[in-house]
Amino acid sequence: MFTSALKTVSATGLGLTMALTPAVEVEPRVLVVGMPGPVASGYFKLGANKDPAGREISVNSRHLILDGRPWFPVIGEFHFSRHPQSEWRESLIKMRDGGIRGVSTYVFWNHHEEIEGEWDWEGRKNLRCFLEICRDVGLMAVVRIGPWCNGEARYGGFPDWIEKSQKWPAPKRWGLRPEHPEYLASVQRLYHQIGQQMQGHLWKDGGPVVGIQLDNEYSGPSKYLMSLKKLAIEAGMDVPLFTKTGWPRMVDPMPEGEVIPFYGAYAEAAWEGSTEVSADIAYNYLFRAQRIDESIASDVNTVSGGEDSESRDRYPFLTAETGSGMFVSYHRRSRLDPRDSASLALCQIGSGCAGIGYYMYHGGENPDGKLTTLQKSTINGDVFDIAVKSYDFQAPIGQFGQIRPHYHWLRRLNLFLEDFGGDLARMPAFLPASNSVNPTNTSDLRWSVRSDGHAGFLFVNNYQRLQPMPEHRQVRFEVRLPNGMRATFPESPVTIPADSFFFWPFHWDLNGIRLLHATAQPLLKEEDGEGGLTVVFAETPRVTAEFVFDPATLKNPSETEKPVVIKPGISQPIELIGADGRVLRIVLLSEKDSLSLKRKTKTSKLEFEEFPRMRSTPVTLELVENLGTPRNWRSSNPEFQLPVAPADWDFQEASVWRLRLPEGLDMKGNPILRIHYQGDVARLLLNGRLINDNFYNGEVFEIGLRRFAPEILTGELTLQILPLQEAMPVYFEPGAKPRFNAEGLALKIERVEVVERVREQLANLAAKKMAD
């Protein structure tokens, strides 16, 4: 139990004070909460939903159910074929340690049958092995089996022989698929191959696969998805949950209960055909009833809306693509703030989300194709370009396994969802009538409540990407419950800090003791085996942490006649004894500690992230070619106004450097090569082979070295950079655009370094891992 590492004091002891000042009379912001209506069920056409141990997955109109209890799944997207097989286990463990409990992954058809009839399931394309590791590390899996995927892959994952086939007419618009028996016969063969890979790894077998997504972003007739479901089951893929994206709107609705729609929302839209700040994305920072982000696929989608209002009362609000990052396209060089993703996720949860899927949670790289490169590009008729190799996505875990700041922000949220998500899933969202639906309105505070009519959580989002948000002074809330009770808090008005986002509980039963409200964010809980309960909270920065308990539920009611104000610190949690004798302990962590808190360990002590001590070593550069000649960035199509990415031949005019790595690098620690540069596009080649590329967005170009060892230690490492042209229309984040010279060009290397953990720390980490 946590208390094995903590000294406790009573509510009148150390580490806290009692608020003695009277509450200031301020008119609270009021929300009337109704009693949730009955859930609907019985119409869902689930597949085999029991595992050999009898654990059952089911669903109703409000939430998923696991083992008879409400279940709030937390899923992270990670594409197995975009990552080396040798690093899968390490990556999946990082995901698990970040609070992820399930992995979603695409099966890109052209990664496995680039040439018709030639199947490739080896190495990084071995789906069976990937699922085995998911099972071994304790992660569920949702497999997005296509046949069309998107994922910024070449032709959305369609092999060229499918995309360019003359056997059937091309679909009339984006979002449709070929309607031809030979096409479906090819899909049937694909599904048979995938089914063989999954054999023995489905939920019914005791395996990790609990769900399958059919196609992606499909907007045609429902009969197509019904055909895919039939083909999947015939191929042996009988799983509890069959899903689809809830966008765009289909020609006709799916038969009820056959397929569950999953939704999405992003912090940026790198696909937009614009070089201005995206206006539509700002709506994702509002609490709202609408589930669909209509900006998704707006580059090509001509069908407005999605299965939203029609399905809102019949399906739970689940997401497949809550954006935890964003790719960098050639014409939109986004650079995300960690809070962009964290507050976006909070907005979705505060709007009623009952299961969250982060896209992408782990970045990757496009594999080498046998015939072509495998990225989305304008050469193939797409409306934007992405990098040839890199699919880093600015994800919480980067392309080379780098841990980024939003990994910690999302982990803090995920810890809460693991321990309390089941309670939250039962609670629908209630939105104040005063909530603005206009994201340009920054004067009205954005808040919502999720409640079961008895208790709940109040969500506040005072953050919006690229929009400074003001503080709100003299704020109190009043939640009026259907039983006549009210939760009015805080006791005294507070200032909601600028650019902040958080949630607070009210009328919460904690081990028989009712927490009337707290101005702190719950993180996780632990039972001590003797009937006691410890609950860990995170402070809301610049807001006093105030806890108010119902005296009638305490053994000594006089102990908390006034609000309890707690100061952050793990050494002295407060301890309360309920009227029934059970013990409740409250621990409050500082902002910093809450972001470094890890899942409880085998010793049941709170464990915090030890941020590694890093060492930087400069890399020797030798200039080989000093060209940097401007290229023609315009499309050959005069109607296409956006710039197009450089082709291989354009790099004949690049400036070129030869890099010499420092000696003695410990490749086991995965040292990172960091290239600080300004320019348009940078490419790194090893013995003439492209190993990574980067569209400049103001961030450092990073390459993990371990996967290229030992070749990279002795081979020729070459860096190519093309100049960025000031006249080229490209979107940059504020402050990210480089400085241009008198000729309107930007090309500069500031420094190149290798960053690695110090060896002593690596040895300590290895010893600790063996001890655990």
Which residue stretches match the model-derived regions?
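Bacterial N-terminal signal peptides
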Residues: 10-19
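Hydrophobic faces of well-ordered beta-strands that scaffold small-molecule active sites
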Residues: 74-76, 103-105, 141-145, 210-214, ...
